[in-house]
Amino acid sequence: MAQSPERTLDEVRVNSIRCRGVLFDLDGVLVDSTPAVARVWTLWARRHGFDPETVVREAHGKPSIATIRELLPNANHEAENKEVERREIEDTDGVIALPGALELLRAIPPEKWAIVTSCTRRLAEVRIGAAGLPNPKRMVTSNDTNNGKPDPEPYLKGAHLLGATGTECVVIEDAPAGIRAGKAAGAHVVALRTTAGDEELRESGADWIVNNCAELSVDPANNGEEYLLLRRRTK
């Protein structure tokens, strides 16, 4: 039997979750932009004398300007951020949809899902287009929030766009910062192994851990039903 939105941790260990909406992170969940992101941040890191590998890791899952503020507290943050974004928008080589992403999005009614990303709106639109994914009816970007992940604000806004509360939604994430944001918003969080290892994902609060969206399926709402049933495929 499908459980109500108010679920305990024990209940979420089963293989289905009843929810009113699904909130997707973009990079590392729906889209693989890793090569492009690495190229842009490697150039930035070398220009400022930082270790590229460390910077690329730190930048994942957070607004670019947050990374810049952390690493260059005395810099012109807006100017640096505009330069990073310009390079990211121009570099879409190798940006592709991740396994199962297109199929899962098509299985969910458009009004029941949203993208919640640390990208700017323009960058998100460019990557969605490059990956050949459908444009979301609802999207929350760094342009829409005062506080980025791991703050819950982005996911709370995403839930609101779906006419739901955080506790009524499932968040699908890959980054520890995003997982913490989803949990802080009250959502159940499905973590993908596209970026971090299982231990780090669990420590961040993930309820489920799967390889990619191909391991998830949805029984869609029918005839005006409010809820979806998100399932985890079992072997």
What are these model-derived regions, one by one?
Residues 1-20, 112, 121-235:
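Asp-based, Mg2+/Mn2+-dependent phosphohydrolase catalytic module
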Residues 4-110, 120-122, 133:
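N-terminal helical cap/lid subdomain that shapes the substrate entry/recognition surface
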Residues 32, 115-117, 191:
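Hydrophobic residues in well-ordered beta-strands that form the structural core
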Residues 43-46, 115, 210:
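Intrinsic disorder/low-complexity segments enriched in polar/charged and small flexible residues
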Residues 97, 116, 147:
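Residue-level marker of regulatory loop/turn positions in helix-turn-helix DNA-binding domains and
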